[in-house]
Swiss-Prot record:
Keywords: Kelch repeat, Repeat. Kelch repeats lie at residues 112-160, 254-301, 303-323. This is Kelch domain-containing protein PF0436. It comes from the Archaea. Pfam families: Kelch_1 (PF01344). Signal peptide: none annotated. Disulfide bonds: none annotated. It comes from Pyrococcus furiosus (strain ATCC 43587 / DSM 3638 / JCM 8422 / Vc1). The keyword Protein biosynthesis does not apply.
């Protein structure tokens, strides 16, 4: 599985470069374009040629997000940039030249981004440290040490006051922890995992908090975490396709699920709406291009999906406005 993940990342990079030229050959418009009546594309930045992957993505308040991306810019320069996304517009805040910040689970607290781990350069294990990053002044400091080592996958749920971490170790074992960022305290949870829940890292951008519970979109299934009973069980619904690294975004009408890729690196354009209250799943649209491994957020009116990987241009922010 580890070798497969590395090969997948390599293919995703090649697809992203190919997608950039293919998309441009169709005459895409600069800045922004209206694809359908409820999907719009806006450029991450005017000088970004290709998106090469995400670093972190956090919600600051009801209308503002902070994010980092690895991008190829004009002049063939690769940069790690930090942007503020507000009301459908991205604003360059600075640069974050820290190599381990690659698809890192993160949350926002007290004007800082808490980064949970990250890639260990030259090593398949992840960094066992929580860092606090201030995007306004560019400072980074060690915030807390995580109570576990030798892990290669991590997914995070944030309920607004406490984080829940779901960890996969190198030997394939799974564990869950709660983390109080105000007390800087971790606690190991006595949590059983349902059969088939094996790759929490593939749900990194598909783990959401919705009405008091956590939800993981995991392949063609959805796992439900109840913090009161410390249970993790499968929802009584299945997606019609099995894709990994989907995007999930919680809204006031349910959880929207976007894209993803399968074991053969075929990407999806499907958009689904899952309503946990009645366990219904409905296909509600199509992405403008195949996309996976992209973070997303909801500002109360629109859903934003940023960067990601796939055969599309990946230099856009997809803005999806739910109908109705």
């Amino acid at each position: 599985m580890k070798r497969g993940l590395f090969l997948t990342l390599f293919f995703l990079l090649i697809l992203g470069i190919a997608g950039h030229w293919a998309w441009n050959s169709f005459g895409s418009k600069p800045n922004s374009m209206q694809v359908t009546n409820n999907i719009e594309l806006i450029e991450i930045d005017h000088d970004v040629l290709i998106g090469l992957g995400n670093g972190f993505f956090v919600k600051v308040d009801n209308s503002t997000f902070m994010m980092s991306l690895k991008v190829l810019v004009k002049g063939e320069q690769v940069e790690h940039r930090v942007y503020r996304l507000k009301n459908g517009k991205s604003e360059l805040v600075g640069k974050l030249d820290v190599p381990f910040v690659v698809d890192v689970p993160a949350l926002w607290i007290d004007n800082e981004v808490l980064l949970f781990g990250g890639m260990n350069p030259g090593n398949i294990t992840l960094v066992p440290v929580v860092y606090a990053y201030n995007p306004e002044n560019g400072s980074m400091r060690e915030f807390a040490e995580m109570p576990f080592r030798d892990y290669d996958q991590l997914s995070l749920l944030w309920d607004g006051s406490k984080a829940y971490l779901f960890v996969r170790f190198l030997n394939g074992n799974l564990s869950a922890y709660s983390f109080d960022p105000y007390a800087k305290k971790f606690q190991c949870l006595d949590l059983g995992f349902p059969e088939g829940f094996v790759f929490p890292g593939t749900s990194k951008y598909a783990a959401v908090w919705y009405k008091g519970k956590g939800y993981f979109v995991h392949g063609d299934r959805i796992a439900v975490f109840d913090p009161s009973s410390k249970n993790l069980v499968w929802a009584q619904v299945r997606l019609p396709d099995k894709y990994w690294a989907r995007t999930a975004v919680a809204t006031d009408r349910g959880i929207y699920i976007f894209g993803g890729f399968d074991d053969n690196v075929n990407f999806s354009r499907n958009i689904y709406l899952f309503v946990p209250e009645n366990n219904t799943l409905t296909r509600v649209g199509t992405l403008p291009y195949p996309l996976g491994q992209a973070p997303g957020g909801w500002d109360g009116r629109r859903i934003y999906i940023v960067g990601g990987r796939g055969p599309g241009p990946n230099k856009y922010i997809v803005i999806f406005t739910p109908k109705g």
